[in-house]
A protein has these predicted regions:
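Proline/serine/threonine-rich low-complexity linkers at boundaries of modular beta-sandwich domains
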Residues: 426-444
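Fold-level signature of zinc-dependent metallopeptidase catalytic domains
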Residues: 33-62, 170-332
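N-terminal prosegments of processed precursors
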Residues: 34-166, 297
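Short, solvent-exposed loop/linker segments at the N-terminal edge
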Residues: 447, 451-459
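Bacterial Sec-dependent N-terminal signal peptides
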Residues: 1-38
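The catalytic-center signature of Zn2+-dependent metalloproteases
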Residues: 270-296, 336-413, 477, 481-492
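Extracellular acidic, Ser/Thr/Pro-rich low-complexity tracts
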Residues: 453, 464-469
């Protein structure tokens, strides 16, 4: 976890009774303001739905709550910067999927460069540290039209909050388990491999990677969009640029939340990004959706950023489209370098917002730009990191868009292989700003000894770890790369599979042990665990080596 905060009580000694009384009244008012709920149950179900909630991939099960946006804004009027303060007196409540309000200690975590943030003070991004659930982390964006939020959980599914009514009063709270859509997204990024560098470091378990350096890396993000994207959010000219920046901010709040957690990386949108936001399709420098998403946007974006922004003025460039159903990073691991401004993401359903767009698509393509290859094994790209069965389930997989899906959506974290690739790539990068963070001690981790066990025998892996800065979470992942023949139907977990991935990744938990297969499968006396379309766990009935 990147940020760990401690609560501190304010202790003041007042010499005069008058000052004591005034201060006491202030504390009473502050407590009342923060305890007064911003949320209420929905009593009237007669309201128009937001465009985002009408997408096919929107969950079927969710909780709806009504938000008093003005009251929330008042509570957030003075929030400390997380990099300048270790404590905050701002506490707000956020509903979970059961409708229960949970308290979070709030800090500002802007996605804008200071100049851009000063120009648009009404668009904000926050991080919250759980009080009632001490392992919960909130990432929330705020703009004049409402909020979007993402809550990282431990031992249960992560949660999302998105506008459900068109007027931004009613919100849907749902988990990250979503239905599979019928409009596939295709990532056409060529897997130019960092495999050589990865292989050089393979097996060097004692080597300390960049993530242990106690530094947050901040990159300057030049974010552009096609006119269709701006129009989707109601912006038809430059006077409405705030509508587009609010959408940028909502997406990057979630993307940065994941990148900070897994990579200790943050991206700030540059002030001049407003110069590459377009409003009229006839005059923007980008091809129509079908052609652009087919690959034309790579070169068009790079040319636009070079001429309008200047290569010295950004570290990573990306384009948001609104249709076409494709993504392409342009290159892999090229932040700071040639080709750094050629990545794009565009949905197939005409809805460039929401959890699917943010996590499954944008985080995936930006993951490529920072150095991560695909981790699925339904096809083999020779990168050395096809370590997940079938579609995979982590961000660099293809969950929900293949014919061999582990599940219908990506989980909002990166596989170990992706983290290793990105951290390896970051060691040679000089363009980011480096900021020391409070969490200075890397966890001490021991995965245990190697074992030989009988075939078809269930087993448990238990590690040990300690960290003086806070509570740890644990995620066991298999790290065996798929062979050339272990694709398509052979990418599924199988008891006779002699090599390659046979165990899917599951969300991090608070305990250091994992059952193989899942305890439910063991109780059912089954050697396999079924996923959405394939088996995702299988006890080997043949001799083989497994690496975790």
């Amino acid at each position: 976890m990147l940020y760990l905060f401690n609560n501190h009580k304010l202790n003041h000694k007042m010499k005069k009774h008058l000052l004591t009384s005034i201060f006491s009244l202030f504390l009473v008012f502050l407590t009342f303001a923060q305890n007064k709920s911003h949320w209420a149950e929905v009593k009237d179900n007669n309201f128009p739905l937001s465009k985002n909630s009408q997408r096919e991939s929107f969950p079927k099960e969710f909780k709806v709550m009504q938000l008093d946006l003005n009251l929330l804004k008042q509570s957030l009027s003075v929030v400390p910067n997380r990099l300048k303060s270790k404590t905050s007196n701002v506490i707000i409540s956020i509903p979970n999927t059961d409708g229960v309000l949970e308290r979070f200690q709030i800090f500002e975590a802007s996605n804008f460069e200071p100049e851009l943030q000063a120009q648009f003070p009404e668009i904000r991004s926050y991080v919250g540290v759980g009080i009632d659930d001490k392992l919960a982390i909130l990432r929330m964006s705020l703009d004049p039209n409402g909020i979007q939020a993402m809550i990282f959980r431990t031992d249960k599914r992560n949660e999302f909050i998105e506008p459900y009514s068109a007027d931004g009063r009613i919100y849907a709270i749902f988990t990250s388990s979503r239905i599979k859509g019928k409009l596939p997204f295709t990532c056409s990024t060529q897997d130019q491999s960092l495999a050589n560098r990865l292989s050089e470091k393979a097996g060097k378990q004692s080597e300390t990677l960049r993530s242990s350096s106690s530094e947050l890396l901040t990159f300057r993000l030049a974010l552009s969009c096609v006119a269709e994207y701006s129009n989707y959010f109601g912006a038809t000219n430059s006077s409405q640029v705030g509508l587009v920046l609010a959408a940028f901010n909502a997406t990057m709040t979630r993307v940065n939340g994941v990148f900070e957690k897994d990579f200790t990386i943050h991206m700030n949108i540059i002030a001049n990004t407003t110069n590459v936001i377009y409003y009229a399709a006839a005059s923007d420098p980008y091809s129509p959706g079908a052609t652009g998403a087919g690959g034309a946007w790579n070169a068009e974006l790079q040319s636009t950023l070079t001429s309008v922004i200047g290569e010295a003025n950004y570290d990573i460039g990306h384009l948001f489209g609104a249709s076409g159903g494709g993504g392409n990073a342009g290159c892999i691991g090229c932040v700071c370098d040639s080709g750094k401004g050629s990545g794009f993401t565009s949905p197939a359903n005409g809805i460039p917002s929401g959890d699917t767009f943010d996590i499954d698509y944008v985080a995936h393509e930006m993951g490529h730009q920072f150095g991560a290859n695909h981790t699925f094994s339904h096809s083999n790209e020779g990168s050395g990191v096809n370590m997940e069965p079938g579609s995979g389930s982590t961000i660099m997989g293809y969950a929900g868009i293949t014919s061999r899906d582990v599940q219908s959506n990506s989980d909002d974290y990166f596989h170990y292989a992706s983290i290793f690739q990105v951290e390896t790539n970051m060691e040679s990068k000089t363009c980011p700003t480096r900021t020391s963070i409070a969490n200075t001690d890397a966890p001490t981790v021991n995965a245990g000894l190697n074992y030989t066990i009988p075939k078809s025998t269930p087993f448990i892996l238990t590690g040990t770890a300690s960290d003086p800065n806070g509570v740890l979470t644990y995620c066991w992942e298999q790290i065996d790369n798929a062979g050339a023949t272990q694709i398509n139907a052979n990418s599924a977990a199988n008891v006779t599979k002699a090599s390659g991935p046979n165990w899917r990744s599951y969300d991090p938990v608070s305990v250091p042990s994992r059952y193989f297969p899942r305890i439910q499968s063991i109780i059912a006396n089954s050697a396999t665990t079924a996923g959405l379309e394939i088996n995702v766990e299988a006890l080997s009935s043949v001799a083989r080596t497994l690496n975790f």
